[in-house]
Amino acid sequence: IEKLDYIKALGFTAVWITPIVENASGYDYHGYHAHDFSKVDRRYESEDVKFQDLIDAAHAKDMKIILDIVLNHTGNFGEANLCKLFNRNWDADQSSIDECMIPITQKDGGKLPDNYLSLPGGQQHDARLTHMKNTQGKNNDTHNYWHHVANEWNWDDYSRWYGQIAGDCVDLNTENPAVSNYLVKCYGEFIKMGVDGFRIDTGGHISRLTFNKAFIPQFEALAEQYKAKRNGGDFFMYAEVCARERNVVYRNHENCSPFYYTWK
């Protein structure tokens, strides 16, 4: 908030910020490995200043807030409302996974093995993933909240909708209405707060049909309903598409594919 005047003086009219939903810890500081879509990560707020204050301060200066959101995947520590595997200890060192992420083990009514913390890192990862992707041959993800395909996919065909792009990005089954409705509910809260647009991460890894049916209409309806929170302004959405074919972006016209519009 203190830097908004400086940013505006540079000529910028909007601030695009990385995802703010709660992540795990350690390397998951950047926002792209959600642990709880329904909460703002405490590391971005203080007791006196909340995300709403940033939105209001930007609007007061006639600036916009573009929020980066992730619909395609979670992190690999489960998700608090889809597959709860850990409790979060905010009083511990947030750079230490073992200290701040408290496993909910079987003896405590959870899903992780009782010896979880003594397992090597790779086995810990497998113990988490089996409850999200059924990687050990058991049907643990009975609600089908995640795609169960591993890493066999191609950048430029439909397989990227179902494959997992990395070990720390567990692919959500966005075709499942329970998943898409949950994501719309969570991110819809930010529309209600007055954010001016969404930059949608890994958009190319979700089918266009799912976007057109499960996400875009619901976001647009909320944006229209809460238009006054943006001082009557439009709501802008754009998505990341990472591919090897330039025509994925704009009909094979290379000069239209970069996103540094004002530099051309």
What are these regions (language model features)?
Residues 170-176, 199-204:
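Active-site rim elements
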Residues 47, 51, 176-183, 211-212:
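Aromatic/hydrophobic pocket-lining residues that form the small-molecule binding cavity
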Residues 26-38, 72-156, 217, 252-262:
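Aromatic- and acidic-residue-enriched segments that line the glycan-binding/catalytic groove
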Residues 16, 66, 236-238:
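A structural signal for isolated positions on well-ordered beta-strands in alpha/beta enzyme cores
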Residues 1-6, 174-193:
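Short, acidic/polar
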Residues 1-64, 72-74, 79-80, 114, ...:
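N-terminal structural segment of carbohydrate-active enzymes
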